[in-house]
């Protein structure tokens, strides 16, 4: 796990904290199922990932597909945002996240969906 958020992650985190007043609570860099998630809202089973240039390689893209499939089987939805989208239009990113949350009912947490010790990948 990184000690500090990247600038785009920090910018998104500030925006996500604004969603708390509407009852949406995100955790940052959460260790779950052997992975560190950039942000996760467990109640709504929503994962947010901030992707930089390293995610454009085929190897990393395959890793991301596998990871997303692992969480999809657990009932989680993953939204990925490019650094540039957060930098250039944070408002649109937050609006999209809010729209997804508002149209997704909260899901019950089961034992299998609770966090487990993470690992860096």
Place the predicted regions along the sequence by residue.
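Nucleic-acid endo/exonuclease domains
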Residues: 1-110, 116-121
């Amino acid at each position: 796990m990184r000690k500090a958020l990247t600038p785009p992650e920090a910018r998104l985190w500030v925006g996500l904290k604004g969603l708390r007043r509407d009852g949406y609570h995100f955790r940052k860099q959460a260790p779950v199922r052997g992975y560190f998630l950039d942000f996760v809202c467990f109640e709504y089973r929503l994962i947010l990932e901030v992707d930089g240039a390293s995610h454009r390689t085929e190897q990393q893209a395959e890793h991301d597909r596998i990871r997303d499939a692992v969480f999809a089987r657990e009932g989680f939805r993953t939204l990925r945002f490019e650094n540039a989208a957060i930098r250039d239009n944070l408002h649109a990113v937050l609006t999209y996240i809010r729209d997804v949350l508002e149209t997704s009912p909260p899901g019950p947490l089961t034992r299998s969906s609770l966090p487990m010790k993470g690992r860096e990948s």
